[in-house]
Amino acid sequence: MTTTLRPVEPLQHGADGVRSRRYQVCVNGRPVGGIRLSTHPEYGPSVARFQDLRIDERDRRRGRGTVAALAAEEVVRGWGCRRIEISVPYDAGTALRLATALGYVLRSRTLAKPLKGARPVLPAGSTARPLTAAEFGPWLAGGRERFARHLMAAGVPEAQAYAKTDEGHARFLPDGAASREARLSVLEHEGTPVGTLWLGLWPETAYVLDVETAPERRGRGHGRTLMLLAEAQAAEHGEERIGLNVFEGNVPAERLYESLGYRAESYHLYKPL
């Protein structure tokens, strides 16, 4: 039997420069599923994304998804893409196993937790204050470097890593420290700054966009305090859930988030082509 991809629409060109196309997955000409491919809106035309891959229930467990995924890689190679990315829901075990078997590498996970019960209280001696205008520039530069290096360590070329970082800052901090949907805080312990927090406050969720403990202050529980601060600020804003992204291999952060009740919602993987 032959598994192929059959286009069901012309190649689409979005106003943002993203190309996309939907395909039927066919076995000997018989439709058994569907797939949608696109270029990446942030990394540009050299990076592709699986938007969707679906195989009909009766045709699963026969290798259709594997062949369709490999055929999709050939399609985007023809578009000039050099990397492909996919996001998999936490409970889609079959899809995660398939991606891993095909050589996709886990870059990061999205974690989240519901906000229930009493608002967290910071430990004695710890207080929070807004990031000042004078502190904003150095904080932004340090965060830019940190995030870009995380991306580079996870397979993103340098130019793309910095471009994505800058795009995120422009989108989420359009007015700098005064951006309406951002809360930028400094954590102090006994009057000394020990860390910073960038919390996004959006209609549907709160999101920890950056959290950093000063290197010389690590190992003293300030990271946990910063996360409690994030929960307290989110609850104060009326949010019912809080999320974050953690890069694969950041074991201390993973352990901290797990101990605080965060659970995986999705996995983000990539593969060089």
Regions found by a protein language model. Give the residues of each.
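Conserved active-site alpha-helix within GNAT-family acetyltransferase domains
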Residues: 66, 90-108, 224, 248-266
